[in-house]
Amino acid sequence: MRRVMVLFGVVIAGVKGFMLTLVSMFRPKVTLRYPSEKGPLSTRFRGEHALRRYDDGEERCIACKLCEAICPAQAITIEAAERGDGSRRTVRYDIDMTKCIYCGFCQEACPVDAIVEGPNFEYATETREELMYNKEKLLCNGDVWEEALDFRIRKNRPYY
């Protein structure tokens, strides 16, 4: 009698397993085929850094060095020079992406929205030196992602 009960329990467990599989076969898929399919990103996602420009092509950074001062990882290095009209601009703007912790403090501290963390999360490299971003690389990122960056900034600041 005991063997019959054990056998009955095994059969019931098997039927339950098959039912679970059968039900899940007709549910919508939740798996993304990553390289070809990408999931949605939050407008507040913090990815690869970029320096933005004004509409006339001039860089936004005014060399106030607030981002350098607030960076907890000390990943940002800025050198500034004064221009003929009395304003300052950056001569050197470097970010060591191997040190960066993607906290977003630099973006929050910037009074002119010059430094932002963009939507790009695919920036793997083969060497460590490629993760040392200079001003030209950051401006290039800003030019490539400007439309998405502008949308994200407007979306996160509804009261301005």
Swiss-Prot record:
Keywords, sorted A to Z: 4Fe-4S, Cell inner membrane, Cell membrane, Iron, Iron-sulfur, Membrane, Metal-binding, NAD, Quinone, Repeat, Translocase, Ubiquinone
Enzyme class: translocase
Topological relation to the membrane, as annotated: Peripheral membrane protein
Residues that, per the record, bind [4Fe-4S] cluster 1: C61, C64, C67, C110
Top-level taxon of the source organism: Bacteria
GO terms under biological process: aerobic respiration
Annotated positions binding [4Fe-4S] cluster 2: C71, C100, C103, C106
Cofactor field: [4Fe-4S] cluster
Record domain 4Fe-4S ferredoxin-type: where: 51-81, 91-120
Primary localisation category: membrane
Described purpose of this protein according to its UniProt entry: NDH-1 shuttles electrons from NADH, via FMN and iron-sulfur (Fe-S) centers, to quinones in the respiratory chain. The immediate electron acceptor for the enzyme in this species is believed to be ubiquinone. Couples the redox reaction to proton translocation (for every two electrons transferred, four hydrogen ions are translocated across the cytoplasmic membrane), and thus conserves the redox energy in a proton gradient.
Family under the similarity heading: Belongs to the complex I 23 kDa subunit family.
Name this protein carries in UniProt: NADH-quinone oxidoreductase subunit I
